[in-house]
Amino acid sequence: MFQNDFDDSFQESADLTELIEQFEKSIEKEESVFLDEDALQRIMEYYEMRMEMFKLEKAIDYALSQNPYSSDFIIRKAEMFLHKKKYADAHAWLDKAALFDKNEIDIYLVRADIFIETNKLQEALSVLLEAEALTDETEKGFVYAEMSHVYELMENYPKALEVLFAAIESNPENMQILEDAAHLVDMTEQYEQSATLHKKLLEKNPYNWMAWYNLGRAYAGVNLFEKALEAFEYCIAVNDEFEYVYRETADVYFRMDDMKKTIEMLRIAQEHAPEFDDYSYKIGVCYERLEDYKNARFHYRKAIRTDPYYDSAFYRIGETYRVEERYDAALVNYKKALKLDEQNEDYLATIISVHRILENTQEATTYMYALVYSRTDVLTYWIELIQALYENTEYDEALEVCAEAGLRCGNFAEFQYLESMILFKMGKERQAMIALENALIKDFARHTILLDIDENFYHHQKVRQLVELYNK
């Protein structure tokens, strides 16, 4: 049986090759050779699959020269104009197709595509509603799928899912429509509704592997992990070449905190898509969770070999070294990550933390400035920088940063409290008390920042007297 299937496939491929050669020779020699409509469609599909658009257009024009009244070929011509973004010409050719077969569903689908590309979503929807009235139950699935796409572009996700579910019920064996459902279910969190629909599909056809996959995702969405794993197992039993099911199975095991099973599933997924560098990274995360830092680093580096700009992988390598208290090695990798994403707040904050552990005061301050300027709107970053300068007795600089913070971040009372502390340390007691009084008037509740940063200042007699005065 297998040999017969192979022979048929081989013969079909040989026939297509011969057909393409015959067509290309006729074009080259400018000879007209009659080809039936089926042969012409096969030629077009061949060029379309290979994205050879110039040759595809030649094939369409050739087909039209022999079949000028064929609505199929006229629609093909309209699609070619759509590809070229010549929208008026595309509409004109669709109008021509309608003269020969006004009920042809593809006329409406291609016209909707034109409206979608030109951001005329309401017009696209109107065309598809017209098409819905003309189609039989099987064709309705394609119309509903296109409608779902329009609603999604309109950001009406519940309606997009509702229509897509209708498409699935009309055409339950269409894998593309089933695949589209997965992300819409996640966006709308309609997991129970998805589970109900896909169970109904599986009652009719238990070999529908995409339905098993979607059912598994629905169960995972409501944390029914054992049921999700069972559904994924059925999916694999029917189609063990489907890469995404291994990824989703791995994700469920990860959420169950079973790192060893997660790694096992990720390895299988990686066999199906070795070019996907994220698998090595994910395996690294699992080993890191298992506190096997050497293996974690091995897989992070493997991900980096595939993608040298994988900043997250450099960062995770740094984290494994930090846990082992190998701070210099950690910093090397943190800085590589930061070089690839220069304003990443997590990277900057971690580098600051390590420099503080190593008591590299100047380096820590340098990166604190970088953190502040990466997000000038974050109050806590300014406070931490001013506090660091204050603790390093760099009072003049701390005072300048207070003024800059007020301008860049906002006129927060915290900056006035910090200013009062700095002025006091600089021996400017009168100015310090004025700044403190202004801060207390502005926002008394924030005065506890004084206690957090300098307990001695907070308990100073004059400070206590002023605080008590405004403690109403």
Please describe what each predicted stretch is.
Residues 66, 99-101, 134-136, 170, ...:
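Structural marker of alpha-solenoid helical repeat scaffolds
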Residues 63, 96-97, 130-133, 166-167, ...:
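Canonical positions in the second alpha-helix
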Residues 38, 72, 106, 139-142, ...:
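Start-of-helix register in tetratricopeptide repeats
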